[in-house]
Design a protein with these regions (language model features):
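Glycine- and acidic-residue-biased ligand/ion/polar-headgroup-sensing regions
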Residues: 51-52, 70-85
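Double-stranded beta-helix
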Residues: 113-145
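Short, surface-exposed beta-strand-loop junctions and turns on beta-sheet-rich folds
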Residues: 64-65, 90-92, 129-131
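Short acidic-glycine-tyrosine-enriched beta hairpin
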Residues: 88-109
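Conserved short histidine dyad/triad with adjacent acidic residue
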Residues: 47-69
Length: 145
């Protein structure tokens, strides 16, 4: 099923959030600070939209031990477009999403893959760490069986 929507929405399968799609109009349309992640999610993603002169209070982040069981990632499409394929934990395709310039995708669980739709598509990918290497951090989906 391919969805091409203009509102932030969760891709849910069997009561589990697999991904979150934030179109450009919502990612960058609000004023102030807007977070798209839930507090309990391993990765936190939000956007700023402030006017000149806004000052953000200087701060540090406290050392806090956290238990992180999965790698989650955020994809920001800077330019071009891509097709995102969202899979459940059993490698079953649940949904396809077309993402365009300035759209954001948060991959929370299950599997995913991408197809670049335009030349010179530029994407910023952000993941939680530490990175333990491809052999430990990920499994390739067997989509033939």
């Amino acid at each position: 099923m391919e969805i091409d929507c203009m509102k932030t929405r969760d891709i849910i399968h069997n009561d589990k959030i697999l991904a979150r799609y934030i179109p450009a109009t919502e990612a960058w349309g609000s004023s102030d600070l807007s977070f798209f992640s839930q507090d309990e999610e391993y990765i936190q993603a939000g956007s700023w939209n402030y006017n000149k002169g806004k000052k953000l209070l200087a701060h540090t982040h406290n050392e806090v031990e956290r238990s992180v069981l999965f790698t989650q990632e955020v994809i920001y499409v800077k330019s071009g477009s891509l097709q995102a394929y969202i899979y459940d934990d059993n490698s079953i395709l649940v949904e396809e999403i077309t993402a365009y310039a300035d759209d954001v995708l948060i991959m929370l669980s299950g599997g995913h893959g991408y197809e670049i739709l335009e030349d010179n598509t530029k994407v910023l990918e952000i993941k939680n760490g530490p990175y333990l290497g491809a052999e430990i951090d990920r499994d390739r989906l067997n989509l033939d069986g």
